[in-house]
From Swiss-Prot:
Site (Cleavage): 691-692
Name of protein: Preneck appendage protein
Gene from which the chain derives: 12
Post-translational modification: Autocleaved to produce the 74 kDa gp12* assembly attached to the phage particles. Autocleavage of the C-terminus is a posttrimerization event that is followed by an ATP-dependent release.
Record-linked InterPro entries: PbH1, Pectin_lyas_fold, Pectin_lyase_fold/virulence, Peptidase_G2, RHGA/B-epi-like_pectate_lyase
Function: Structural component of the 12 appendages that hang from the lower collar. Adhesion protein that binds to the host cell surface during virus attachment and mediates teichoic acids degradation.
Cofactor note: Binds 1 zinc ion per subunit.
GO cellular component, one term: virus tail, fiber
Pfam families: Pect-lyase_RHGA_epim (PF12708), Peptidase_G2 (PF11962)
Domain notes: The N-terminus has three domains that function to attach the appendages to the phage, digest the cell wall teichoic acids, and bind irreversibly to the host. The C-terminus is an autochaperone that aids trimerization.
Binding site for Mg(2+): 285, 310, 312
Main location, first listed in the record: virion
Keywords from the named record: ATP-binding, Degradation of host cell envelope components during virus entry, Host-virus interaction, Late protein, Magnesium, Metal-binding, Nucleotide-binding, Repeat, Viral attachment to host adhesion receptor, Viral attachment to host cell, Viral tail fiber protein, Viral tail protein, Virion, Virus entry into host cell
Listed GO MF terms: ATP binding; metal ion binding
Native source organism of the sequence: Bacillus phage PZA (Bacteriophage PZA)
Lineage, highest ranks first: Viruses, Duplodnaviria, Heunggongvirae, Uroviricota, Caudoviricetes
Amino acid sequence: MSTKPELKRFEQFGEIMVQLYERYLPTAFDESLTLLEKMNKIIHYLNEIGKVTNELIEEWNKVMEWILNDGLEDLVKETLERWYEEGKFADLVIQVIDELKQFGVSVKTYGAKGDGVTDDIKAFEKAIESGFPVYVPYGTFMVSRGIKLPSNTVLTGAGKRNAVIKFMDSVGRGESLMYNENVTTGNENIFLSSFTLDGNNKRLGQGISGIGGSRESNLSIRACHNVYIRDIEAVDCTLHGIDITCGGLDYPYLGDGTTAPNPSENIWIENCEATGFGDDGITTHHSQYINILNCYSHDPRLTANCNGFEIDDGSRHVVLSNNRSKGCYGGIEIKAHGDAPAAYNISVNGHMSVEDVRSYNFRHIGHHAATDPQSVSAKNIVASNLVSIRPNNKRGFQDNATPRVLAVSAYYGVVINGLTGYTDDPNLLTETVVSVQFRARNCSLNGVALTGFSNSENGIYVIGGSRGGDAVNISNVTLNNSGRYGVSIGSGIENVSITNISGIGDGINSPVALVSTINSNPEISGLSSIGYPTVARVAGTDYNDGLTLFNGAFRASTTSSGKIHSEGFIMGSTSGCEASVSKSGILTSSSSKTSSERSLIAGSSTSEATGTYNTILGSLGAVADEQFAGLISASQSRASGNHNLILSSYGINTVGSYKVNGGFEKINWELDSLNGRIKARDTVTGGNTWSDFAEYFESLDGQVIETGYLVTLDKGKIRKAEKGEKIIGVISETAGFVLGESSFEWQGAVLKNEFGGIVYEEVTTEDGVKFKRPLPNPDFDPNKNYIPRSQRREWHVVGLLGQIAVRIDDTVKQGQGIDAVGGVATDGNNFIVKEITTPYNKEKGYGVAIVLIK
């Protein structure tokens, strides 16, 4: 007897049934590897399997050699026969089969034909009931009712279009082709991969959609947890291609803000395709924590609200990545019905929309009109890297709805970061390309590029009116012949920021403006335009060279500052300036503060404007109190009073109203604007080398009296003086002071007392400031045109005091007195002749002398 061989104990090696599950050969499906790397991995893995197999054969040969050489052949035969008779051999076979089933069972094992004719529903049901992973091989497997998926189901096919599961023509209404078993409370742990679901909607006739609720979709997942759907194709769907929803056959409508019970959650949909659907390709309702990536939804059967991807009522925390849509109403529609909560907290990371009507459509129906309640749930959408190609409505979706690249309605908290819209046929979209409308709020559009929409009215339009959008930021936009109005803002939009807009409009049909706003308070900066006749139109005013507008607190070129009001500014300043009230500002100053509205400090230090309408310029340590007070080049001074101004001064304090003051450590001069008075502490000088004091008098005959004639009074008016008459003065052109001109209005415009003094009344301003002003004469008509006395021929400047040029005859001598004949001075006893400047000329009939009139 030979020695019993030392047999080697082999460890079990990995599952290798690549024909069933890619998970048994994971490297072949590792998308990070190149094709060559995948093939090398597979060859290496198979070589390892071959080594193990060869070793098994060698060890088995050792056993057989031992049996034969030691005469154990008969004993082995007897043992095998006994096992067979006792049933142990059958048990071994069954055990092996059961172990093989762990790798998966084929529906054909349970009688499925896959011939496109035979009803294979029972084979599917038995295979699924076995509890083992189920494999659907090549073929078309007809079913007479929907396939139910219990928890812990694994269903894998030979690939899209290779393994096809299809409704038979005899199937009635209300059936979904595949759905989880417990439609109310749901199931868990379902894995679906690599087959086609054909709803065979043609069996129902043309134009047929779902009968209601979530019924009649190709794949319905209701109230399920942990579902993985990969490489599934849904075609010819009565309702949806793939529908992820909550428990129940009917979608719940519990009101805005009310979440439905039993949501589906932790759902993964990858590399799937939907086409020929009656409603939506891939859709979600009342579910959460969903990922949809690398899917394609296209070409629906019908023309209603047929969306490629629809994130609908009550969906939340959904991420869509790198998907594609074509020929649908909405490429991606994120929405809700009026009596359901809106989808919220949705993220879109890359999408390509080709020839959809509205590539990206975000809305909460029933919350758009001014009389509708504001949506409480339509919030938080972030979408990046969106592509829209040739949006159009050639098929007439939704009663010929107008195409859009993007439409946002009723949502708030929407962020678009990277959106490109392109068309090569400008006639496909002629209204608005991108719209924020119907009470949408707090939306941000950044990085938008539109090209080719040359017949469109608006590139980007924030629609105004009673149900318009608001709080919109539009930035970094490039418009290439897209929109007669590049960016347009409607009426009533209170909060909008428009920055860095670049537009070319030389290929547009009648371009108007790159940016247009109805209201006057937008924030605008960084506009660049070619081909638009107007760069910016704001509240009806055109700006052809660009425009920059800022709202809110503003600080620039300032190292530090205190509080700045939302309607205040600080520029070019240092050391803790504050503009803490509305409509106030500080320029190129330090340690200064505005504490009342409509106040300004510029070029100053340690100054404060505490009253409204105050101004401080070029001053140090200046304070302006009350209203309309100001200091200009006035340091260590305080202007207290209404309409009080200090100029070029140091160390003075002023009170009162409607005054202009100046001085050094004390007030030295004052202009009283209210009463027209001038005060000075020292000398007031004139500009002429000889000056006189004069008043206006009216001529008796209304005619002009020429310069240099002596005049007398006659009936309160003047005429040329004659010999022996009282001379009151001379017609003068050298007066340093002239009274009685009535320069600005009729001398009777205000009431006067019997002594000619002005009658005053006390008035109080809206801000409570009291002051006196002249009482208007009720007979005065301010609408009548007034001509001052200086422009009327009958009024003359009569020098009454001073050194005045007088017409003389040949009798007048220097140092002697004068009298008058016909207004010409002759020898006499009045006044004194200072000097004769022009000797008497017989031809002219007079000379000229300077006479001291007093």
